[in-house]
Regions:
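Active-site loop segments of alpha/beta catalytic cores
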Residues: 1-161
Length: 161
């Protein structure tokens, strides 16, 4: 089950944790209760810097978060929750990897860095992408490098970890 809601911008939540707990969490908790009673996995889709709400999500059974965006303290979150919360993403699609002049080696090294940082111990699903028109050759090339490196490095990584 996916609960899709946004409570934050890239800089901060746009609703206080107190207001979230009073106004939104009861509805999310009801959805979580239904999903847990049916033994379903709960994925929270929530963009932006929304790390302030993770404890609340855990209260109603969320076990996956996408997209876990780099504006959050993802290393701290990974350390705190380990594999109890699957971080889906952890990729900066708007940073240097997304720039048209990003080199193949840089893009590939970022895939490896992301996997090396978040994959150990489980609780991680790589989700890398490049923003832009799929007709743009630069976007196509960077997306292909990401996919290829994820496949090659990911297979090798999980064989040894």
């Amino acid at each position: 089950v996916s609960i899709t809601d946004d409570t934050a911008t890239a800089k901060n939540p746009f609703i206080s944790p107190k207001m979230y707990r009073e106004l939104v969490k009861p509805y999310h908790a009801r959805l979580g209760e239904i999903a847990m009673n049916a033994n379903l996995i709960i994925d929270m889709h929530n963009c932006g810097r929304c790390e302030d709400f993770i404890e609340d999500w855990m209260d109603f059974g969320v076990s996956m978060w996408n997209p876990a965006q780099v504006v959050n303290d993802l290393v701290g979150i990974k350390k705190k929750y380990g594999n109890k919360l699957v971080l889906v993403g952890c990729w900066d699609s708007q940073g240097p990897v997304g720039w048209p002049d990003a080199t193949e080696e840089f893009v590939r090294s970022e895939v490896r860095r992301c996997m090396d940082t978040f994959a150990p111990g489980g609780g991680f699903a790589f989700w890398g992408s490049v923003l832009g028109s799929q007709d743009d050759p630069s976007v196509k090339a960077r997306a292909a490098w990401i996919d290829d490196e994820c496949t090659k490095y990911g297979h090798a990584f999980y064989k040894t970890h």
